[in-house]
Amino acid sequence: MPELPEVEVSRLGVSPHLIGNTITRVVVRERRMRWPIPQEVAKVEGQKVTAVKRRAKYLLIETAQGTLILHLGMSGKLRVIDASTPVIKHDHVDIVLSTGKCLRFNDPRRFGAVLYQAPDTHIPMLDNLGPEPLTDDFDDTRLFTLSRNRKGPVKNFIMDNAIVVGVGNIYANEALFLAGIDPRRAAGNISAARYKSLTATIKQVLAKAIEQGGTTLKDFAQTDGKPGYFAQHLNVYGRKGEPCEACGKAIESKVIGQRNTFFCTRCQR
């Protein structure tokens, strides 16, 4: 599943091809996505793209006549290609540009979304979202304060989009390892000092992932559909039974909040 770094890398990759150019057509081949694609997406046709933003895992393609809201879901990916490129299976939407290019949205599982929001109106799905993790709005004081009296596992707590957006499963595992915190520990039983460390490691792993993803930006202009996700060194995620690189003890795995969780019982307390 694309997580925040992958979506941010997508934004960085497609932005130069969109901003300042005009959307000539929005071609919808399949409307049955996570939510039905509305007819109103056509309202951006003939409009110049003024900005491409990200909020949580939503991409916002802004024009004077409204905003297209994209979500990659479980399996979605974006390609900037020649508009004449033959369609392949699961190519559900094209945002065709005046340059002869198009932004093509491919989504095999159809859990993604393409929605329209009129100018100066409220975007309901962005309600109740916490701060972006790489901004100053996300700090250890907020995290510690909101954690008080929370009995659930700290991993679930930091993955709650009302607390902070975009800390998906991979990066929650990695941040907790670097902070030395057991993901099973109750969020309310962690000290302010340890939340300071955890806030720093969340920012660290997300920033590093985005930086590493920057080397794949060339993929967004290719026709082979490479998603632009990036291989990176992971300390615990997906490494059940392998030795911890810090202490040598075998990495353990447990399902927490319906997600596989990986940790070292020696390094994480």
Swiss-Prot record:
This is Formamidopyrimidine-DNA glycosylase. Involved in base excision repair of DNA damaged by oxidation or by mutagenic agents. Acts as a DNA glycosylase that recognizes and removes damaged bases. Has a preference for oxidized purines, such as 7,8-dihydro-8-oxoguanine (8-oxoG). Has AP (apurinic/apyrimidinic) lyase activity and introduces nicks in the DNA strand. Cleaves the DNA backbone by beta-delta elimination to generate a single-strand break at the site of the removed base with both 3'- and 5'-phosphates. It holds the Pfam family zf-FPG_IleRS. The keyword Transmembrane does not apply. The keyword DNA-binding applies. It catalyses: Hydrolysis of DNA containing ring-opened 7-methylguanine residues, releasing 2,6-diamino-4-hydroxy-5-(N-methyl)formamidopyrimidine; 2'-deoxyribonucleotide-(2'-deoxyribose 5'-phosphate)-2'-deoxyribonucleotide-DNA = a 3'-end 2'-deoxyribonucleotide-(2,3-dehydro-2,3-deoxyribose 5'-phosphate)-DNA + a 5'-end 5'-phospho-2'-deoxyribonucleoside-DNA + H(+). GO terms for biological process: base-excision repair. DNA binds at H90, R109, R150. Belongs to the FPG family. Keywords: DNA damage, DNA repair, DNA-binding, Glycosidase, Hydrolase, Lyase, Metal-binding, Multifunctional enzyme, Zinc, Zinc-finger. GO terms for molecular function: 8-oxo-7,8-dihydroguanine DNA N-glycosylase activity; class I DNA-(apurinic or apyrimidinic site) endonuclease activity; damaged DNA binding; zinc ion binding. A zinc finger (FPG-type) spans 235-269. NCBIfam families: fpg (TIGR00577), PRK01103.1 (NF002211). Its cofactor is Zn(2+). Monomer. The active site is at P2 (schiff-base intermediate with dna), E3 (proton donor), K57 (proton donor), R259 (proton donor). Binds 1 zinc ion per subunit. Its EC number is 3.2.2.23, 4.2.99.18. Gene3D superfamilies: 1.10.8.50, MutM-like, N-terminal (3.20.190.10).
